[in-house]
A protein has these predicted regions:
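Gly/Pro/Ser/Thr-rich low-complexity, intrinsically disordered segments predominantly at protein N-termini
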Residues: 1-159
Length: 159
């Protein structure tokens, strides 16, 4: 298993970094699941797993601020347009058949809100979120766009 760590920020050196990341390579699905069971659901880190590569990221205060701003904007827009949305925060989006897992900073069901209303989210049985928000200050070794795309989260990259 290979290990990489990164703690960087776009702020000056004396500032607190926005996030810290650890990358583990060669992690089997069973090892990943055992680790997740050990650390539990109530944790401050976010995870992403892509076919043997595991990223554990600890967000700091600066990392959280854009998520809050974007969430407020989405909620205000939905209220103005009078549409129902369901915000689920840092929900674990998992597909064992694809060997992929990701936890966005926050996510929203907008178009598919009625399909998940009152349900526990299991991507085997319900559609993925319509919007996933990622606030990244450092470059991840994992391509989260590929993970989201494989899970079926709508994606459009502006070029």
């Amino acid at each position: 298993m290979n290990l990489q760590t990164a703690t960087t920020s776009t702020l000056p050196q004396e500032s607190v970094p926005a996030e810290a990341r650890v990358i583990l390579k060669g992690v089997s699905w069973s090892t990943f699941k055992a680790l997740m069971a050990d650390i539990g659901e109530d944790r401050s880190c976010r995870i992403a797993y892509d076919q043997g590569m595991l990223e554990i990221m600890v967000p700091y205060e600066q990392h959280e601020e854009p998520k809050i701003l974007i969430s407020s904007f989405v909620e205000a827009l939905a209220d103005e347009l009078e549409i129902e949305i369901r915000q689920l925060g840092s929900l674990t989006l998992e597909r064992e058949d694809l060997i992929r897992v990701v936890e966005p900073d926050t996510c929203f069901y907008i178009q598919n809100e009625s399909k998940v209303r009152g349900k526990n989210i299991n991507l085997q049985n319900v559609p993925p979120p319509d919007l996933a928000v990622e606030s990244d200050y450092t470059h991840s070794s994992l391509n989260k766009f590929n993970i989201y795309a494989s899970l079926g989260v709508p994606f459009k990259r502006n070029r």
